[in-house]
Amino acid sequence: MQVASAETYPPLPAGPFAVGCSSVEQDFARMQPGESPQLYWEGIPADDGRPRYITDLLTNPATPVVTFNVPDDGELYGKLAGKPFNVALIVCYPAAVDAGRRPYNLPNGVAVPRMQLGDQPPAFADDTRRWPLLEFAHGLAGSPLDPDYMFAMQVLASNGYIVFAPFHADARVTDVKLEDLQDVIHAVSNFGDYTAMQAVRTLALKNALDYMLASSVWNGHIDANRVAGFGASLGGESLFLQAGAKLTDSVGLSSKQVLVDNRLKSIATYVPYLGQTFFPALGRDQSGIDFMNPIPVLAIAGTADTTAPLAATQQAMERLNGTNILVSLQGVTHGFDFASADDIFTWTVVFLNATTTRDPVSLARLQRMTNVAGGGDDRVVLADVLPYPPAGDEENVVEFFNESLGHYFMTANANEIAILDAGVAIQGWTRTGEVFKAWPIGSAHGQQVCRYFGTPGVGPNTHFYSVDPNECAILSHDPQWTFEGYVLQADRAIGGTCAAGEMIIVRLYNNGIGGVANHRYTNSPTIINQMVSEGWVVEGPVFCTPP
């Protein structure tokens, strides 16, 4: 990454909270000889066709089990259409240390921490606080009680999130494996069941969220305006679908929307399965993602992952609008890479804190972070971090582009924005979609930013902005430049950086490409790298703006 302010951050310390979880008490004596509990947790039928699910082993009526009706849509749900379906849940949360709860040890070596027994209520670290809620969607052929998933849930809960995870038990619908879908013949012959399994996963997440927000046990502790998702492998795709992306529903790559859940505010994913480049999961060329709500998305992908290849993930991420970050882990294959745990959870927690709890320091860190120290080799592939909506006396600075001139222009002036949007009096300018925030002239925040335009017939046909009084003074004595006024306020970048809670705006120069000078101002590392590849020069951080 070319931005001078890019930073390597240390791994986040352990979360500040102890963790407790809801009951998953089970009677393993109910299993047949030779069976393992994983067969029930994953919903794998017996050889004679007898269904198996975790509900067959559960002994505590207080364990959440959500039952819902599948829509009567055979195209999406196949044999499940119009029938009832159920999912059990486990919920982990920030817990009181001295609640007297003990771990519940499972046969696979996992200990469920401070588990509720009988009708015990959850024992929160702060019973008066409302916590952000995090959906946790595990991958295919797994369960929340797998060691890596339980570890991940505890990390996230220890950082102040109520985390709930459905037991998807995908084998109840199909025995197709992700690896099988790399075989086109196998994909075609099993595609109907596979589509149904993907679609019902999304329904399960939506209905589980309904339950959490309505349950008298949990709803009084949840901030319903701060709901996010974490998905691993196929769980990542499930969250994309919940946010409105269309699912590939035929071998011809047609796609169909499962649902749109507007409650989901951001999505973090690890090795998200989004199909193969030749068989994308979200429609042709991943175009189904165009129908997804424009919420922030983080994707962490392995460069050696052939099951969920980085190329397919990048193809989808490049279609997103809004805050989106793609991080690659060098040499990592599919599955949880414990050597990269610090990288995975530092990126994830910083992202969730920035986009869900709206912590300005986390948002500024997210913009600057290029990798996490130690651990695996993590690298940013794509990064666009948008500011929060304006608050108080903040205002948006909107960027425009004129294709015939090859020039960029930015303004916070409402009249200028309206004129350029109308395209009548001044033609040829369109919004790029890029914005950053500033303060208006006269604000108690920031310093005045001067704007100059090249003097007609003498100077360049472009605008120049500076918060540096020395630069403004130099231009005022240069006949090539005409002063247009002070147009916004921002803090000045000192030593190439900004305060912890501010966004960094970098100035780029086109190096005279096309014969006429032009500058561009951006907080996007992706744009910076793109412009550098086109011959632009990074002049460095110039403004510090509100997050």
Walk through the language-model features, giving the residues of each:
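Primarily recognizes the serine-hydrolase "nucleophile elbow" in alpha/beta-hydrolase
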Residues: 208-282
